[in-house]
């Protein structure tokens, strides 16, 4: 190109209004569903680091009644809590469906023993209700709310309350 010939400036682009209205943003929460006894429970999926088959457990003398013992996870000691006992349900036997949900409390991994893991569910915030006020409910502080997606019923657990005082 010679000095005298320059390219014209590019055309100026003007923003166009959107043709379609934006859909409303629906806030959702993904939860991991699991079974304790005959009831469905859930924790936020982001709180669960791993799901394990039940490994060998080492009993710890004088541990709390909720604590089954400890286990080793790739060289890290994990305290194992019987979630049934923790929320006041009767103990049940282990079987091939029994799983350990590994969650985190500060810098310490905690294993929560559950009867079975069922599914990951995406809940809309409007499907989540506050915990019901049921007189005489033991361990009500462990309940965060309930959700009824598609006719199912999940009891949402309050993980910080569950892990407190272990």
Regions found by a protein language model. Give the residues of each.
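An acidic, low-aromatic, low-complexity terminal/linker signal
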Residues: 1-166
